[in-house]
């Protein structure tokens, strides 16, 4: 009896070799792109590094006509606005995610989840325009003025809420950033909370645990790595945001007060505002060094988050 011919020819060794080469090439391209970005940033910013050295990091003055540049104000604005954004966004996102996964009725879960995803899809320039023309005037009248009056007599804390209520400034930029990153963090938290085995939660409810106890003793310990990942995703988004912050932060190189009401600047805003108009080679180099600093900050945040997740996983495995 004649052997039947197979319907298709199985891939040979040659196909495996080609596929392996293509996959390795794709991975190599990623590394080459990363290395190319780092090298190009260092080369482009080298004149500024040579002239100002490490003093560039703590110099407040930024005087383009006289070729005097310092990164302290943009670094301060970037870090403070991102911290404010996380301070607001993390608890709000946590509450949204828990409501969607544990408390929301079935008919509400899907529409609310879609609404959160739509918020994440809104372009940042729309947030910036809304923040400048709608949010800032209301923020000045209904938050900055009354809170400033209440806090003005409190030592130390009062200094953070002193000064005129402009509506725009570091605090306003932080709030806008928080609104922008809430959908990202909430979506990630919701997804990781849904990964908690239903059997574990039902067992906890079966022995008399309340919803609060199930959340704190079952859901959070099981999903803490994913929660940290979501928070770091939001932080990365806040650090790199440009247009919305440019609209609302004030774009001034002043650091004469600790007040969060005062206008300031961020690294991304400085780059967006000045790069097209930079004329001298040193000015361009200083802006490129700002980009290098932002790259380093982002890398440190990512490395810290990875280290934290590894430590948590290691401690969990040791139990």
Please annotate each region the language model reported.
Residues 1-27, 305-319:
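Transmembrane alpha-helical segments of polytopic membrane transport and secretion proteins
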Residues 5-17, 21-22, 42-85, 105-106, ...:
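Periplasmic/extracellular loop-to-transmembrane helix junction in inner-membrane transport proteins
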Residues 51-69, 127-178, 261:
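Membrane-interfacial helix termini and adjacent extracytoplasmic/periplasmic loops
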Residues 85-116, 306-314:
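Transmembrane-helix boundary motif in ABC transporter permease subunits
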Residues 94-99, 155, 162-206, 210-213, ...:
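Membrane-cytosol interface at the C-terminal ends of specific transmembrane alpha-helices
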Residues 115-118, 122, 126, 185-196, ...:
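Transmembrane alpha-helices
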Residues 190-194, 198, 273-319:
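C-terminal transmembrane helix and the adjacent membrane-cytosol boundary/short C-terminal tail
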Residues 237-280:
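Glycine-rich helix-loop "coupling/hinge" segments at transmembrane-helix boundaries
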């Amino acid at each position: 009896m004649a052997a039947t011919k197979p319907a298709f020819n199985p891939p040979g060794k040659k196909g495996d070799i080609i596929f392996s080469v293509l996959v390795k090439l794709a991975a190599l391209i990623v590394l080459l792109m990363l290395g190319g970005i780092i090298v190009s940033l260092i080369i482009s910013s080298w004149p500024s590094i040579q002239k100002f050295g490490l003093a560039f990091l703590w110099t407040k003055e930024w005087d383009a006509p006289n070729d005097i540049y310092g990164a302290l104000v943009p670094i301060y604005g970037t870090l403070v606005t991102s911290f404010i954004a996380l301070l607001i966004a993390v608890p709000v996102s946590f509450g949204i995610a828990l409501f969607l996964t544990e408390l929301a009725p079935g008919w509400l879960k899907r529409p609310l989840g879609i609404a959160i995803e739509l918020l994440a899809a809104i372009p940042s320039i729309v947030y910036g325009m809304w923040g400048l023309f709608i949010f800032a005037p209301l923020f000045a009248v209904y938050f900055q003025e009354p809170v400033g009056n209440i806090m003005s007599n409190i030592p130390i804390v009062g200094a953070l809420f002193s000064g005129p209520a402009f509506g725009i400034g570091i605090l306003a930029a932080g709030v806008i950033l928080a609104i922008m990153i809430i959908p990202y963090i909430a979506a990630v938290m919701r997804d990781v909370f849904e990964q908690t085995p239903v059997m574990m939660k039902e067992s906890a409810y079966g022995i008399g645990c309340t919803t609060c106890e199930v959340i704190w003793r079952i859901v959070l310990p099981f999903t803490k790595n994913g929660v940290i990942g979501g928070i770091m995703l939001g932080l990365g988004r806040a650090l790199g945001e440009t247009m919305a912050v440019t609209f609302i932060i004030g774009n001034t190189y002043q650091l004469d007060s600790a007040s969060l009401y005062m206008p300031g600047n961020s690294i991304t805003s400085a780059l967006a505002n000045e790069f097209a108009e930079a004329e001298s080679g040193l000015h361009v180099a200083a802006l490129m060094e700002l980009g290098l600093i932002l790259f380093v900050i982002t890398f440190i945040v990512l490395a810290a988050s990875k280290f934290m997740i590894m430590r948590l996983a290691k401690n969990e495995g040791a139990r």
